[in-house]
Amino acid sequence: MTTKRAYKLQEFVAHSAAVNCLKIGRKSSRVLVTGGEDHKVNLWAIGKPNAILSLYGHSSGIDSVTFDASEVLVAAGAASGTIKLWDLEEAKIVRTLTGHRSNCISVDFHPFGEFFASGSLDTNLKIWDIRKKGCIHTYKGHTRGVNVLRFTPDGRWVVSGGEDNIVKVWDLTAGKLLTEFKSHEGQIQSLDFHPHEFLLATGSADRTVKFWDLETFELIGSGGPETAGVRCLSFNPDGKTVLCGLQESLKIFSWEPIRCHDGVDVGWSRLSDMNVHEGKLLGCSYNQSCVGVWVVDLSRTEPCMAGDTAQSNGHPEKRSCSGRDPVVLNDNNSKTVLGKLSVSQNVDPLLKETKSLGRLSVSQNSDPSTKETKSIGRSSTSQNSESSMKESKPLGRLSVSQNSDVSKESRTFSSTGSLPGTPHRVSSTNVSKATSGVSTAVSNAATSRRNFTKANPKANPVNKAADFAPVIVPRADPRIEQATESRAELDIIARTMPYSLQAADSRRSPSSRNNPDLPDASVLEMSESQPVEPNNIPDGGTLPGGKVGMRGATERSINDFRYKRYGRSNSRSRMGSPPRNHDENYDLVSHRSNRDPSPTESQKGGRFQSLVINRERRGRFSNFEGPVSNFSSGNMPAPNIRPSNMFKQRGNHMPVEQGIDSPSEENIVEDIMGKHNQFVSSMQSRLAKLQVVRRYWERNDVKNSIGSIEKMADNAVTADVLGIITERNEILTLDNCTSLLPLLTALLGSGMDQHLSVSLDLLLKLVRLYGSPIYSSLSAPASVGVDIEAEQRIERYSRCFVELEKVKACLPSLARRGGLVAKSVLELNLAFQEVSS
């Protein structure tokens, strides 16, 4: 290698006395704040040798510092227990808070809302309201100092780690301790949350890193012991690995399974903070009065480097560890979370779910002569197929038990969260060749209460293609069922709040990839609600055992599809609706039985979903059973989006003689499914954001409601809320007008007519209310004497004027759109002429 994997970016003298603490700004990763024994807080631009700003005010040494989410405020806790907040834009102290009886050694800002938490050597954890200028809650429970604390990304819990070796989880809403983790044997020095899942990682002086499930509050596993204590840790933004900073090295762990992939020797001594930015790890350490900034190139470390090698060798499914996900779910850049949830499948419609040690375990028996074992972290699935090959693969935490000799089904809707609907793998010994006109295949995946795991490229089962054949599955009247299912699912979507939902990515079997004689469709699956029965078997009579050729059977099955139009899509974007007769054209929809719940696969991703809501809903939904799907609390049912076997995946080749009318049909199907998946995900993300706004709204805190909308930068959410504000005249004050106008201006950049109409309607109302005083204030003479209220009012008028001028500049282009938008633009133009004349 010509380039070092780790190097020192800079080293500088930060204080005139010893440095006690430092923090990297998470928003930009370009700024650094340090606190020292010289009673000062210094602000630095990373890469520059001189301080941007020095903040004074404390009368004792600084023991903890941090930025808020926007890098506008800095909080610093001192040895006296006093906490001071500085506004960096004005370089002045905005709050001085007292309450701790000893050193304040940890601080953290709430992810949204004007709150922050502090931990002290007095063993107390305090929550502070910046607006009320005081402590709103004190949590007692630690027996020694609180070293580290973090708010959960949803802002509902705060997690603290202490010198007493205990990690405690506190519920901010209920104001009480939820649980505590006591497995560490040394003081807690660092903790971090998984970016997509309900997972907490903790690092300790006992030289181990431990992973905790925040839904079941169980220990998932432990990494180490290492050569030194874990001083800092941070999840890679892709969520696959956690980066652990030790005394003089960096260790890279995967959490499922837990193993150390790589170690990098770095020269940092007392590492204090680190952050991942654009594929680089930035670490900051201090020694006496000096601060060192270190960079580790993650693209040159395992497993990222292994992923790059795999891509060059023709395995594009390996993804880089740059921290950026190329797949976007919605306009807010929510990152796609593909499912790692896996299921085992077999011949008969039996589904037997058992819970062992708090997890589901699955065994399938098709032929006692062979076994296929699959394991992922905490669950294992054994499956006996006709081959004598034994495989070991990482899967999800769900496993299902199926037996080929019993024909019963046991479903559990209790707090264990197990769900029915495991698909069945159909062996060629039980299926004859397909007849034209009624052939289709449905790929379904089972889901559980814990279906929030992220995709792992290695977690794709390998199946011997020669052992499987297509299945012929009839269905009831699809027109009635589609309407019923669409209404039911939309109702469920409106009442639930996962952040991300999408189907697991099915990939081509390596066995079929290596054997040119085998087709790409390696396995065809069917729902448990549609077992192989005599009325499901085509006119071939008895089923030949193991003699059915996959190529011929698949060709016959696929040749039955003659898709001639794709324009119509229902709300579920399903695939594979069987024809009602041979002369009709159909969209791609999946079939289900009329009354049985369908197996589904869902995932939670994007940002951290509210765990409290998840727990509160267990009782409400635990026994829900509807025509669409059955699910436990917090799990969002969704259709299985991707056809896993009927059509080729990327990089696969379908036999030429199959005679598909259009060579791009499978791509069209994938596009349809992908768009539906994005729609569902964006709806759930929007719901989550609206609930954040609602919490402020219920407290009549309109100012912060508008402020939270501005931070979200989501046009859909903005339009939803502004549509309500338009009808509430009492909200349209001058103070709120200054906050609303930037949102309305930004909304004019949307390409949707609905958003434009909402913005133009509210703009028209504001111009009629405040247009005249805004424009007349510009020419008004200056007042004599000091009138603070008048000056504030004129300042608001000036800000409104700037935004209104931006709006006027946008109107000519909007007028060319025509329709209702052009009509609204004309009315707004007339209003501007009236108030400015």
Swiss-Prot record:
Phenotype on disruption: The double mutant ktn80.3 ktn80.4 exhibits normal growth, but the quadruple mutant ktn80.1 ktn80.2 ktn80.3 ktn80.4 has a severe dwarf phenotype, with small and round dark-green rosette leaves as well as wide and short petioles, probably due to cell elongation defects, and associated with a complex cortical microtubule (MT) network with stable entanglements. Plants missing KTN80s have a disruption of KTN1 recruitment at MT crossover or branching nucleation sites, leading to an abolishment of MT severing.
WD repeats: from-to residues: 14-54, 57-96, 99-138, 141-182, 184-222, 225-265, 267-304
Name the record gives this protein: Katanin p80 WD40 repeat-containing subunit B1 homolog KTN80.4
Gene: KTN80.4
Native organism: Arabidopsis thaliana
Compositional bias annotation for Basic and acidic residues: 553-563, 580-595
Superkingdom: Eukaryota
One Pfam family, short name: Katanin_con80
Keyword list, A-Z: Cytoplasm, Cytoskeleton, Microtubule, Repeat, WD repeat
PANTHER family xref list: KATANIN P80 SUBUNIT, KATANIN P80 WD40 REPEAT-CONTAINING SUBUNIT B1
